[in-house]
Amino acid sequence: MLKYFISLLVLISFSAQAKEELFIYNWSDYIAEDTIENFENEFGIDVTYDVFDSNEVLEAKLLAGGSGYDIVVPSGSFLENQIKAGVFQKLDKSKLSNIGNLDPDVLAKIEAHDPGGQYSINYMYGTTGIGYNTDKVDENDITSWSILFDPAIASKYEDCGIAMLDAPTEVMEIALKYVGKDPYTEDEKDYEVALAMLQEIRPYIRYFDSSQYIDDLANGEICLTMGWSGDVFLAADEAADGVEAWYSIPSEGTVIWFDMMAIPADAKNVENAHKFINYILRPQVAADITNYVWYSNPNKAANELVDPEIFEDPAIYPDEATLSMLFADTADSPKKAQLSTKYFNKFKSN
């Protein structure tokens, strides 16, 4: 009996050791419905998939250490400083056989975030713009940030509901550009000018959130939001009967950003992390995600597999004219990060 019991313990111990796992921390509403399940079935790896809705939340976990995740997806502007802080380990590109599918033009745009792509692979990219209900919002208003930042215009939409991203860096950069200041400024007086403008429109904002607006726009609970391109298009795709939503890039310009897959330095399942990244780099997998979340992927080999309605829309896959209206999301200096958070919080609490 004792011999049987010992054998059973050994078997249980071996089974526990043999269990293949992977822990992923990604943005909410940012993957196709079957991506994880398909990966698990093919590789026999159990995936724990958690979500966040702000770079600040992710960064706090990473800098504290011991996050428990094997793959995380920070925006490139945050990734830059996280690399400097030693948060990530270098990728083993010998394990990424599909890396050649990446578009050289996209790689050039993200070079500043991670020179040579030593630590990260671009997952998806997009822009920050205006999400709106086509029946409740005047189409003449959606071409400019004035729809959110001019109180005379924003007040028209107070009753049908305005939401704002809970994203200090992006909101403050866009607000600074709107008032004619450098979006990358470290001059506190410039932030005071932007705050004065934001305080004028604060009474008309129903809430600040970086994911709730998707369902609310789709269900008609709000009619206007600052939002991320794919999230707004997802709301449009899932809109309830009688609700139509769409996305606009304002004429004053906006941020283009790139979200990056990276492996934390203390990740426990590094081999499986590389398997997942390489899986995402398959053309069909990348296209399936884009077709579901409506965000651009960097996989050139996937272009022909992306729904033409998505691939041919310059608000999703920017053409040269659209690119000329965009400015890069860059890494914050400690001072800029502090100013962005300080003045954004003043805006929220006003």
Regions found by a protein language model. Give the residues of each.
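Paired acidic/hydrophobic, glycine-rich loop segments that form the ligand-binding mouth/hinge
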Residues: D70-P74, R206-Y207, C223-W228
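A ligand-binding cleft/hinge motif common to bilobed small-molecule-binding domains
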Residues: F78-N81, L224-V243
